[in-house]
A protein has these predicted regions:
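Short, conserved structural patches
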Residues: 36, 44-165
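Membrane-proximal amphipathic alpha-helices
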Residues: 28-40
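Alpha-helical hydrophobic helix detector
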Residues: 8, 12-27
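Short amphipathic alpha-helical interface segments enriched in basic and hydrophobic/aromatic residues
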Residues: 24-27, 31, 47-51
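N-terminal leader/signal peptides at the extreme start of proteins
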Residues: 1-5
Length: 165
């Protein structure tokens, strides 16, 4: 009976670090998934806001409607006075593309900015879809037991139909 004395303490000393490592890893994974989901929701709000606006010039990235949509997605208002919902996510990180269905190729293709394309200021037709993505992604730096892991970018992308004119 004396030979088993202290074995529970030894087992606990061996198992507790492993359980703690799994717990910390789960928390970091949850943080990354939460960040990805929040960025995806922000991009979906941006695309939906743009998809319901009238007279948006998608060929001009400085169009007031485009800028208002980006600010509305990042902050709770259409001006850029408030802080972003996700830290270090800025307006210049968003890439907005317009697409239209090509019946010859039978697929969605990027809509060019011309009178025959989707440039409404030159008399072009509106796009069929709005695609919002991040130009270089959103870099996350996971920390595991005080050690920084290799940083990697999150690259969500959202596509919604365009309902404006």
């Amino acid at each position: 009976m004396n030979s088993h004395r202290g074995s529970s303490l030894l087992e606990a000393a061996l198992v507790v670090p492993i359980v703690l490592a799994l717990l910390v890893g789960t928390v970091q994974l949850g943080r990354i998934i939460y960040t990805y989901t929040m960025i995806e929701k922000i991009m979906l709000n941006l695309a939906r806001y743009l998809g319901t606006q009238q007279g948006v010039n998608f060929c001009d990235s400085q169009d007031p409607s485009v800028q208002a949509a980006i600010n509305f997605a990042l902050t709770p208002s259409t001006d850029s006075a408030a802080d972003s919902i996700v830290a270090n996510l800025t307006a210049d990180m968003f890439q907005i593309q317009i697409q239209r269905y090509d019946s010859n190729a039978q697929q969605l293709v990027a809509c060019d900015c011309s009178a025959t394309g989707c440039d409404t200021s030159q008399g072009g037709l509106p796009p069929g879809f709005i695609v919002v993505s991040l130009t270089d992604g959103y870099t996350v730096n996971p920390i595991f037991w005080g050690f920084r892991m290799n940083a990697f970018p999150l690259r969500p992308s959202v596509k919604v139909p365009y309902g404006g004119t």
